[in-house]
Amino acid sequence: MAEIKNYYFSSESVTEGHPDKICDAVSDAVLDECLKQDPNSRVACETLAKTGMIMIAGEITTKAKLDYQKIARDTVRRIGYTSSDMGFDADTCAVMESIAEQSPDIDMGVSAGKGLFNSESSNVSEGAGDQGIMFGYAINETETFMPLTIHLAHRLAERLTKVRKDKVVDYLRPDGKSQVTVEYKDGKAARIEAVVISTQHAAGVDHKQIEADIKKYVINEICPANMLDSNTKYYINPTGSFVVGGPMGDCGLTGRKIIVDSYGGHGAHGGGAFSGKDPTKVDRSACYMARYVAKNIVASGIADRALVQFAYAIGVPEPLSVYVNTFGTAKVHDEVLANIVSKELDLTPAGIIKRLDLRRPIYEKTTAYGHFGRELPEFTWEKTDIKDLFANAK
């Protein structure tokens, strides 16, 4: 079947004040505090947020001493929920916890030398923390090798937060969402068909004022002018009002924005969430590694886009499979690239952790505006330092 060349594609993002993102941030703040005190911490931390309360639960084995109340309140305060007028208050919300240690059966499979498959004399290594399939994706339509739709959606959500925190638009509240539809012609991004922004705001603000401010200070600052035209549609708070937001408007849960966190519907997703998980959990670390590999393949110039898949079994260090698909854009066969990945890179959890330096307290920064496509110093998986592995592949 021939590939469709003319189509519309949409991606969404959310702000750090979205209830699910509050939970991601709290879970990763707990993880960061564990890793700060004990880099070998095992963490699986879930958070729920609803009106007036936060619940932290999970399995954590660590030498760290944790003040869950402080971690949760500091995180919510940083996001900006500091008054009951907003529907949530960092200083008055209840913080509950239910934490156990990691299951000894899981520990046996993960800890080097304990399990059936990670204790052979030739391969004493940490086993994968779970089974699963993990994907990474990259495309050369933006400077960060991310799909344009999710890139724009993230930047709009990020800008929405910035104008709120900088008080450029002083009636905005923390909760918000963005969505971008791009028209593709002959397989290339041609124009922006639609922009959706939903932003929480103070009561009594005229809807026309919100529309004007969001267009001026958010959309026009982010969306390329040459991709906006007279037919571009704008949907700004399309219900007419968004006063009730955050956990009062919707219950929040860790791990419920996996497509926002990855590629906005492009590529593929194995189903595992990221936040609250230490790097022995391949749901997180192997996805970061897959992005690293895909980005370096595309950055090398040997392909225009790349999808990389790894698969793991719990307790087994080596991946069960390595897959590369460049959608016919590569200068060599995809199996050549897959063989390079398999032979030249250590894809065990220990190898990934070492290469990407993942036992650091870096994770709360990942929770909003994309785990991928932001070239922050801590985001080692965004480096293109192995592109030469692929540049001259034959």
Swiss-Prot record:
* Gene3D superfamilies assigned to the protein according to its UniProt record, in alphabetical order: 3.30.300.10
Q: Which PANTHER family match?
A: S-ADENOSYLMETHIONINE SYNTHETASE (PTHR11964)
- UniProt: L-methionine binding residues: 59, 102, 250, 281
List the record's Gene Ontology CC terms alphabetically: cytoplasm
Family note:
Belongs to the AdoMet synthase family.
Q: In which pathway does it act?
A: Amino-acid biosynthesis; S-adenosyl-L-methionine biosynthesis; S-adenosyl-L-methionine from L-methionine: step 1/1
Task: Look up the record and name the cofactor or cofactors this protein needs.
Answer: Mg(2+); K(+)
Gene Ontology terms describing biological process: one-carbon metabolic process; S-adenosylmethionine biosynthetic process
Entry binding sites for Mg(2+):
20
State whether it acts alone or in a complex, and with which partners, per the record.
Homotetramer; dimer of dimers.
The entry's K(+)-binding residues are 46
Keywords for this protein = ATP-binding, Cytoplasm, Magnesium, Metal-binding, Nucleotide-binding, One-carbon metabolism, Potassium, Transferase
Protein name as it appears in the record: S-adenosylmethionine synthase
For this protein, what does the record note about how its cofactor is bound?
A: Binds 2 divalent ions per subunit. Binds 1 potassium ion per subunit.
According to the record, the residues making up region (Flexible loop) are: 102-112
Query: Where in the cell is the protein located?
Result: Cytoplasm
**One annotated GO molecular function:** magnesium ion binding
Q: What does this protein do?
A: Catalyzes the formation of S-adenosylmethionine (AdoMet) from methionine and ATP. The overall synthetic reaction is composed of two sequential steps, AdoMet formation and the subsequent tripolyphosphate hydrolysis which occurs prior to release of AdoMet from the enzyme.
Reaction equation(s) it catalyzes: L-methionine + ATP + H2O = S-adenosyl-L-methionine + phosphate + diphosphate
Q: Which residues form a coiled coil?
A: none
Binding site residues for ATP? 18, 175-177, 250, 256-257, 273, 277
Keyword Transferase in annotation: yes
CDD domains associated with the record: S-AdoMet_synt (cd18079)
The EC number(s) given in the record are 2.5.1.6
Q: Which organism is it from?
A: Brachyspira hyodysenteriae (strain ATCC 49526 / WA1)
